[in-house]
Amino acid sequence: KQAELIKKQNKAIQADLEKRGYEFVDMDNRGMSTFDFDETLIIDGKNFVVATNPKTGEQIKVNSAQWPTKGPELAAQGYEFNFDDFVNVRGGVDGPLLQKMKNQIKKYGPENVFVLTARPQEAATAIDGWLKSKGINIPFKNITGLADSRGQAKADWMLEKFSEGYNDMYFVDDALPNVKAVKNVLDQLDIKSKVVQAKIK
């Protein structure tokens, strides 16, 4: 019964996506891997978000390690955010999932491995350069900057990839709200998926 329910949900989601203009490509076992960047592929970076209190003008600098927990707190308080510093990649060492990314490239090929970040799209050049410095080469178009830190934004992006025919999807992110949002969406699809929270040892 559970399998039938999932299939019905899957068809309903597909029908809804088709109405919204997505086109589906039928392919057998098409795998992909999606990695967050900060605190996942890279740690100890020197970038920061500037959070401004619209009432008082008070500014707080939030680094990428603090962002997953501090960001939602400040957003709830009405703070406004400036991500300009995240166009660059400053500092940083190998993150906990960098080797996993290399493994997934060997398994699925570089064209099926993606970086999905809340940084702006303008950061793609710097991210690409940093990855290349680590011996990682994926197509430049596979680096997506959403300029949006909401988990739903990443979930919607994953749905787009599902509509392109991917049916074996791996996603990893350090921010629990992102992990939950993506897992909630992928669990409704009749596909193989694995959603992981990146943790620094």
Language model segments and positions:
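Low-complexity, glycine/serine/proline-rich disordered segments
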Residues: 1-32
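Residue-level detector of alpha-helical secondary structure
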Residues: 7-10, 14, 18, 102-105, ...
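Alpha-helical substrate-recognition element adjacent to the catalytic core
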Residues: 18, 28-152
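Conserved Lys-Pro-Asp/Glu-containing loop-to-beta segment of HAD-superfamily phosphomonoesterases
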Residues: 28-33, 154-177, 182
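Extracellular glycosylation-rich, acidic/polar low-complexity regions of adhesion-
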Residues: 44, 196-201
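A structural signal for isolated positions on well-ordered beta-strands in alpha/beta enzyme cores
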Residues: 112-114, 170, 194-196
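Cofactor-binding loop segments of dinucleotide-utilizing enzymes, especially the Rossmann-like FAD-
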Residues: 118, 174, 200
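Short, surface-exposed basic-aromatic patches at helix termini and helix-loop junctions that form
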Residues: 129-137, 158-164, 183-192
